[in-house]
Amino acid sequence: MAEIVTETERLHLRDWGEGDADRFYAIMNTPAVMRWLGGVQTPETWDAALQRILGFRRDYGHTFWIVERKDDGKLLGFCGLKRVNSPGTDLTGQFEVGWRFREEAWGKGYAKEAAIAAIDLAFGRFGAPDLLAFTVAGNEGSWGLMERLGMARRA
């Protein structure tokens, strides 16, 4: 079993374990979930993204962790931390919180609950001085969550 990084009232945030990548790809690679993320991914594109996710854990000790519901172990998505990699900007190296949840988990407060846990880890365990989140124009779901988390729009 993969190590549980933190937990909330309803959720476990844990490291990626055996079989998670295939399960995640199968349930998350839908037109609705991927709408704001460039569209449905090929297996090759997903594998490259997974290697980046696992690399965050290796390089920084944090990543986008698997989010499971405590009561039944259902994989709901991921949420966690990475470092910004935007060469040529002053953002590179800053902490970023991010999330992706399966469609049936939307609107139930899971993303906010997981994001609060990840933010607590950013400042508590990992010593983040600041924290960023990004989305694209039009993604009102993510914008709304950022605002409910107390984040301020910068652009």
Functional labels for PLM-detected ranges:
Residues M1-E104, I116-L121, R125, D130-F134, ...:
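GNAT-family acyltransferases
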Residues W99, G107-L121, E140-R148:
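Conserved acetyl-CoA-binding loop-helix of GNAT-fold acetyltransferases
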Residues A137:
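Catalytic-loop Lys-Pro-X-Asn motif of eukaryotic-like protein kinases
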